[in-house]
Amino acid sequence: MNLQDELDELKIYMTIDKTTIQELNRCMAEKREEQLFRHHEDAGVKKSTPEKNEKAISEQTLEKVIELENRLKSFEKNSRKLKEESKKLKKENDFLKSHLQHYQEDSESRGKELEKLLRVSSSVEQDKSELQTKVTALEREVTTLRRQVAKAKALRDENEEVVNPEEKEHCPTDKAKSEMATTDVRAQHCDCKTTTTKVKFKAAKKKCSVGRHHTVLNHSIKVMSHVENLSKDGWEDMSEGSSDSETQTFQNLGTVIVETSQNIRPIENDGNQKETDQTEDSRAQQEVQTYSCEDLKAPQNTKKMTFQNKSGSLQKNLHSALPARVNREKCKTKPAQKSSSNTILLRERIVSLQQQNSLLQNARKAAESSAKEFKEANEKLLHQQQISDHRFQTSRQTIKLTLDLAELRKEKEDLLKKVESSSDITSLAEEVSRIMAPQIQVTTLGPSRSTDLEIKQLQCKLKNATNELTKQSSSVKSLKLELLAKDDHMKAMQEKMSRMERDITMKRHLIEDLKFRQKINSESNESFNEMLGTLEKKDLKMNLLISKLNDTETAMAQIKSAASEQLQGLALQSEQVLEGTQKKLLLANEKIEEFTVFVQALVNELQSDAHRTRQQVRELRQTQKSRHACKTSTHKAQTLAASILNISRSDLEEILHTGDEMEIEKTKIDAENDKDWMLYIQKLLQGQLPFASYLLEAVLGKIKENKKLTEGYFTVMKDIK
């Protein structure tokens, strides 16, 4: 805006200068015409010194005017250049402003992108920290599980060490003349079921005792099955159909146990059913139990406690179910006590299992939510390396598990062989009892002491055999229970291993996700660094442009200051020149006024001279006439003229007076001509240029008239003389 104002002011000054120059040109043209007029007037006459001075002054004024015109042209050129430069600077300013706006927008957009990247990086760092915490927690859990596995292996080794001396102790006891009460163990969903053995010492027992044994066995099996089923993970189906089926199976078990105790036959079908049930239970557990790794600590501890309680309760039940049947009243009271204690344990176990169930459900929900959250993140990861690691670890684990399974199968085969040997011993004892029972009955008929002694001896042997059989059966039961516990432990360990594998896969997926996020973060950091580099470059460019703008602004300011100084100098010079020209114009105007006064005075003098000469001529003529009239000759002449003309003398005088009137009219005409000449000269002086030639003609004509009048005057003077 300042440049535009200055340009407007310069334009105004230019217009003012142009008007002044035009006025000066007009004045100079008028002066030239006057000088030409004077030059034509004074042609042939000697020139005087003041005319030379006027010509020199006029030439100087012309030179100055030409210089002023040249300066004005240079000023116009400079003003045009300044206008062009100002336009260029305006364009550059607009261009720089557009660049500044563009760079500002870019900087703002990049600032926003940087903020977004910083937010993303902060969120990624938070995710990293959270995942690191989770990884540390999972590593801790893995270490705890490994410790538990090591403890389980140590316990298994200890159990093997304990079982081996018991086998060594029981091997030399080869007493084939004893009666045994067999026990059947049924495991549903990895459960242990104990039964009490009942030995027949006499063949002639009543049916009421058999029914009593049925009821007691069914009740004890039902209680122990509830205990063992509820000691699991708490995922049993508590429907009515299942309860009815369980009661039926328990009744069938009781009948089977009694029949086997009566018939003394090995039960192989039950073992097969047990294996099928165990496989089905393991499959159901693998399908149902999908727990998270974080919530496994409490259930594992509770499982340990329940397993210990289970083993203790089973041992107690075994020790309590295998006393010597001396008093039947004790055998009747023991199941009632067991049932009451079992109900209390069941209630406590139900409460704890409900709590565990709620905790596990919450954990399951949390695990499902976390799984849903991490599903999308676990897809885009480095699979090959992790799959190879997973295969390697799984191969190692499978090798270890296969070795453990082979050892356990060997132990199981050994135990089955022991069971078969014990079953053979029981069969022999039954045959002996069958053979000895009629002998005892027959010998009772004969009242002989020898037979009584033999019977007593045999009874003592039978008691010893039964005691040994009970010991062996208890040892077999304990071994079977240990086998079942080991199987359960192996299944639990397999489940734990599967869970650990799942956890490891999840952790690997998380690690892959973290690696992917790290890559994204590295890429984002690289892009961020690139953006920073570009921003720095653009900042440098901006600084350069700003410096250029500052330089241009300073140059513009310098140009403005120089232009203003030049304009001020030009204005001062123009003012000085104008003052000089005004002074010269005043002098020229004064000279023109003096010239007009001179012309008017000259014209007046010429007119007055002509008028004087005319009057003098008239006076001379009148004097001449008066002189002739005084003479007689004139009188005679008049009379002769009157006689010749046949006119009276009065008429002749009138005619002579008419001549005078003609002269008066001539004088009037001359006066009018003089007035017209004066008016013509005034019109020429006041009229337009050029008028020098016309004025010269008029003045020369007047001078010629004056010359003629002077010549007439001299002729009249000569005549008079």
UniProtKB/Swiss-Prot annotation:
Residues 156-180, 259-288 are annotated as: Disordered. One of its GO terms (biological process) is centriole-centriole cohesion. Signal peptide: none annotated. The modification Phosphothreonine is found at residue 658. Residues 165-178, 267-284 have a biased composition (Basic and acidic residues). Phosphorylated directly or indirectly by NEK2. GO terms for molecular function: protein domain specific binding; protein kinase binding; protein-macromolecule adaptor activity. Keywords: Coiled coil, Cytoplasm, Cytoskeleton, Phosphoprotein. GO terms for cellular component: centriole; cytoplasm; sperm head-tail coupling apparatus. Its main location: cytoplasm. It comes from the Eukaryota. Residues 52-164, 345-515, 573-626 form a coiled coil. Disulfide bonds: none annotated. The keyword NAD does not apply. It is found in: Cytoplasm, Cytoskeleton, Microtubule organizing center, Centrosome, Centriole. Interacts with CEP250 and CEP68. Interacts with NEK2; the interaction leads to phosphorylation of CNTLN. Required for centrosome cohesion and recruitment of CEP68 to centrosomes. This is Centlein. It comes from Rattus norvegicus (Rat).
